[in-house]
């Protein structure tokens, strides 16, 4: 099952290594990691999306992570009201003969077109994972030439 774990960490060298080492030792599949400084330059907000078999695994992982030096707080926000966003850049094969059709297909997603040339277009979308997967499904038949995803970032609402 997919779980979203957020962590507030001291912004120090090596903390991400120690954090991911715990996940590695428990053989947890990491689907995405995003990290960045917060409103305080001393702190890093990190979002991990992981795949686990059982919910009790997540509880054990969180307990282990909270024991690490330089970890302030770790929480599983999957079942809580939360905001989650991801960015994707997709370069799609778009020769002039089908470009209008492609633009019609992607319009409902409110994508941003960030580059256009004679044979392809590059689009950007911000949304949750489901919205991004839906866009990928729509443009795949036209030919995805390149794609880069940021991974999910999120935090609790309220």
Curated annotation (Swiss-Prot):
Residues 4-79 form the ACT domain. Disulfide bonds: none annotated. It comes from the Bacteria. One of its GO terms (cellular component) is cytosol. Keywords: Amino-acid biosynthesis, Branched-chain amino acid biosynthesis, Transferase. The keyword Transferase applies. InterPro entries: Acetalactate_synth_ssu, Acetolactate_synth/TF_NikR_C, Acetolactate_synth_ssu_C, ACT-like_dom_sf, ACT_dom, AHAS_ACT, AHAS_small-like_ACT. Its EC number is 2.2.1.6. GO terms for biological process: isoleucine biosynthetic process; L-valine biosynthetic process. Pfam families: ACT_AHAS_ss, ALS_ss_C. NCBIfam families: acolac_sm, PRK11895.1. This is Acetolactate synthase small subunit. The gene is ilvH.
